[in-house]
Curated annotation (Swiss-Prot):
GO cellular component: large ribosomal subunit
Lineage: Bacteria, Pseudomonadati, Chlorobiota, Chlorobiia, Chlorobiales
BP GO annotations: translation
UniProt keyword Membrane present: no
Organism the protein comes from: Chlorobaculum tepidum (strain ATCC 49652 / DSM 12025 / NBRC 103806 / TLS)
Protein name: Large ribosomal subunit protein uL10
Family named by the database record: Belongs to the universal ribosomal protein uL10 family.
């Protein structure tokens, strides 16, 4: 049994992780064997995501100052592991969805991304979203296409203007 000081320290540490992360995901892992759990942790680690098993009571203590503490606390039943996403808040959803296809013991409970809470039924939508990096790349591509098309549009306008002037000149003769 953990001492009270140790519990307080862990709750404080988890609270800091909640604040530092752009998003966090609660999962239930009951029934996953050690090998599968290690494989899942490795997938998360490759993506720069911290995955940690935490007691529900410690999570509740860590969330006591959160805006949606009631919604988040409602999902804390059975065993809980938390995936903390510091860089890409969508990456855990993709990993959880992919991993849970082959491992039904892993269940998505809920997530909080930039302060918005998502329930257990929202994993498919979350996993289909583009990451911030992918969105920036698409935006950069769109802007690049727009900038590249400006000279073409200007040339077309000039050609049309010259053509109109030429036609007007022919009509006057």
């Amino acid at each position: 049994m953990m001492k009270r000081d140790t519990k307080e320290q862990i709750a404080q540490e988890i609270a800091e992780k909640f604040q530092k992360s752009q998003g966090f995901y609660f999962t239930e892992f009951q029934g996953l064997d050690v090998q599968k759990m290690s494989q899942l942790r490795l997938e998360f680690r490759k993506a720069g995501i911290e995955y940690r098993v935490v007691k529900n009571t410690l999570i509740k203590k860590a969330l006591k100052d959160a805006a949606d503490v009631d919604k988040l606390a409602a999902g804390l039943k059975n065993t809980t592991a938390v995936a903390f996403a510091y860089d890409d808040p969508i990456a855990p959803a993709k990993i959880i969805k992919k991993f849970s296809k082959d491992n039904e013991a892993l269940k998505f409970k809920m997530a909080s991304i930039d302060g918005q809470v998502f329930g257990s039924d929202s994993l498919p939508q979350l996993s289909e979203m583009l990451s911030k990096t992918e969105n920036i790349g698409r935006l950069a591509g769109l802007l690049n296409n727009m900038v590249a098309s400006v000279p073409m549009v200007m040339n077309a306008v000039m050609r049309n203007l010259v053509s109109v002037i030429d036609q007007v000149g022919k009509l006057e003769k």
